[in-house]
Structure formats: structure tokens, C-alpha cells
């Protein structure tokens, strides 16, 4: 019978900036199980100012999880007990809900999709409205959110 699992983001369940097949699984599940995965995002350099919700575990991760490379904080890995090497796995994303009321955009010279277009480092905090599913840019423009990954 399929089970429901929850994998929280914590200092013992995340790794920062890399993938590695040798990582110990943070969770083991059977095929057909449902997993709710909590995620966090961003280093201390992109935290928002006062008035935003910052999950306490994000600050603990900043203090206690080594940042091996530039990149995202990843929750997991998850081991599928019956999976074999070279098998293709089907993962269905049922729903995505925001945990924070902010996101960020970070631009660095000589990086990203337009490396020659930006000559200064810029960080922008974007207010997120989970109920309206909108992001509000600092100058007031509101954009629809369609989380997909």
C-alpha cells in the first residue's frame, strides 16, 4: 500500500551546490509513494530585508551546511527502493506551494543568458503573494506566478 512521506529541509537533509551519486539518501520510499518535499533557496547574500518571512532552517543551513560550489540548496536525495540502475523513473509533480513571501533575481556581469549586457551586480527582492499567485517587482509591476519545478 502506498505511503505518504514528508522530507523537510534541514541541515541533515540538504546539500548545497552539487549533485553526487554517493550521497546517503535523506529518505527511502517505495514506488507509488507520495512525498512532500520542503525546499529553501538562496545564500545569506540574497536574504530579503525586514518584513519578509525567512524560514529558520534556512539560517541554520547557512551556518552549518558547506557550500561546495555556486548553486542551489538541494533537498534529498530520495532513494526509490525498487529502482535499478539504468531504469527510467516517472515522477509526477502534483502541486507546488510557496513557503516564503519572497524570491530574488540576481544578476552578475559575464554570467547568465546575457553575459555582455549587464556590467554591475544587481540583486532584486520580489514580493510573492501565494493567494493571488503573483510576484510584485520593486517598482510595482505584478506578474503571474506559475511554479513548475
Describe these PLM feature segments.
Residues 2-66:
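N-terminal, Lys/Arg-enriched amphipathic/low-complexity engagement segments
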Residues 22-24, 74-77:
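Short, solvent-exposed loop/turn positions at domain surfaces
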Residues 30, 81-84:
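Residue-level recognition of short, solvent-exposed, well-ordered loop/turn junctions
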Residues 37, 88-91:
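A generic structural signal for residues embedded in beta-strands
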Residues 41, 93-95:
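A mature extracytoplasmic/lumenal domain signature
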Residues 67-71:
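Extracellular beta-rich ligand/substrate-recognition surface
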Residues 72, 95-149:
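Intrinsically disordered, low-complexity linker/loop segments enriched in Gly/Pro
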Residues 78-81, 109:
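Conserved beta-strand/loop scaffold segments within soluble protein domains that form the structured core
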Amino acid at each position: 500500500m502506498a505511503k505518504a512521506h514528508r522530507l523537510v529541509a534541514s541541515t541533515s537533509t540538504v546539500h548545497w551546490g552539487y549533485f553526487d551519486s554517493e550521497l546517503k539518501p535523506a529518505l527511502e520510499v517505495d514506488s507509488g509513494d507520495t512525498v512532500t518535499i520542503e525546499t529553501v533557496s538562496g545564500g545569506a547574500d540574497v536574504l530579503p530585508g525586514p518584513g519578509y518571512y525567512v524560514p529558520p532552517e534556512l539560517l541554520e543551513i547557512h551556518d552549518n551546511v558547506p557550500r561546495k560550489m555556486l548553486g542551489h540548496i538541494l533537498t534529498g536525495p530520495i532513494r526509490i527502493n525498487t529502482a535499478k540502475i539504468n531504469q527510467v523513473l516517472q515522477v509526477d509533480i502534483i502541486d507546488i506551494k510557496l513557503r516564503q513571501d519572497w524570491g530574488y533575481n540576481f544578476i552578475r556581469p559575464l554570467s547568465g543568458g546575457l553575459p555582455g549586457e549587464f556590467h554591475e551586480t544587481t540583486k532584486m527582492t520580489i514580493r510573492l503573494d501565494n493567494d493571488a499567485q503573483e510576484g510584485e517587482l520593486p517598482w510595482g509591476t505584478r506578474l503571474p506566478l506559475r511554479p513548475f519545478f
